Amino acid sequence: SRNMGTQQATSVRQLLRFKIKPSWLVAWILPVAIVLLTIFVNSLLPNCEFNTDMSSLIPVDQVTEEQKEMLGMMMNPTFLIVTTIISGLFAGATINALFAFGAEYGWRNFLVDALREKKFVFASIFIGIVWGLWHFPLILLGHNYPQHSVAGVFMMVIFCVLASFVELYFVLKAKSVYPAAIFHGTINAVAGLNVLLIKGGNDLLNGACGLSGFIVITIVIA
């Protein structure tokens, strides 16, 4: 509950310092755990279930029997989960982190410096609200919540507030903005697993940006 300025000295120069620490590894692995737990929680919600049948993803009229057999193996849930996690971890720490860095430089660098004297909880909520509202034009156009674009604006704000607690913790722990970019990039890379592995529900319930994700991230924060 202390002010961020007294809890950690976080100058702009420090936040941009590239010095790998154990917290970077946690920020890299945690998104995978969040997504996998979200899938589990999602499967327990009403009218939702774990999807093990990926056959609908195979364009049967466009492939040979041999290709169909190979695609069937690739669409095995275990194979899909493992390959998505491996590729997601790689992308999350490289190209995705690079793209996420632009946003994180603003949210977890400029705003953190501006809110230095505020308490951690206040800063997390404030940054999360600003970050969430920044998405509202895309959300109204159907991004993330195509079935509920108006309600989706509020859902995105909630997600961003929750994610801000996690990301700001990493920024202050490592005194660097890079773990936030890695967390952001990795969760974007592996979040698609939920779409493939959950049948039923809707965009307000499913995935990291839905109720199931909110439950998991709240547990992580607690």
Q: Where do the protein language model's features map onto the residues?
A:
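Residue-level signature of the transmembrane alpha-helical core
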Residues: W28, L89, A93, A97, ...
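Membrane-interface helix/loop boundary segments of multi-pass membrane proteins
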Residues: F101-G128, L172-S176
